[in-house]
Amino acid sequence: MHASSQIRLTFNQDHPAEHEDDSSGIAVQESKPALQAPPMYKVVLFNDDYTPMDFVVEVLETFFGMNRELATKIMLTVHTEGRAVCGVYTRDIAETKAMQVNQYARESQHPLLCEIEKDG
């Protein structure tokens, strides 16, 4: 029974039934929309005069998965230049990371500020 159905389908594809409107004989395939990469956002830490450097290193290790050496380097950039990029992510992830850092800083009673900026 199954083989018979396959043969019929093949036959019907070669010769459309009378009720099908296929008079042009042209095969049409719908085009797929072009996919674009989502816009990326930088997560930026800002310097302040009160947050301890060790706390900034802890934040970078905890929320951005950095090792101690890289976290210390980024912390020193924040300290000397006033700001540093911690990572570049899609908008939802960047917003979540910035919110988590700001919430953790407030819970720890530090004024550390983390924001996002559109990359590019």
UniProtKB/Swiss-Prot annotation:
This is ATP-dependent Clp protease adapter protein ClpS. Binds to the N-terminal domain of the chaperone ClpA. NCBIfam families: PRK00033.1-2, PRK00033.1-5. The gene is clpS. It comes from the Bacteria. Residues 9-32 are annotated as: Disordered. InterPro entries: ClpS (IPR022935), ClpS_core (IPR003769), Ribosomal_bL12_C/ClpS-like (IPR014719). It comes from Ectopseudomonas mendocina (strain ymp) (Pseudomonas mendocina). The lineage of its organism: Bacteria, Pseudomonadati, Pseudomonadota, Gammaproteobacteria, Pseudomonadales. Involved in the modulation of the specificity of the ClpAP-mediated ATP-dependent protein degradation. GO terms for biological process: protein catabolic process; proteolysis. Belongs to the ClpS family. PANTHER family: ATP-DEPENDENT CLP PROTEASE ADAPTER PROTEIN CLPS, ATP-DEPENDENT CLP PROTEASE ADAPTER PROTEIN CLPS1, CHLOROPLASTIC. Pfam families: ClpS.
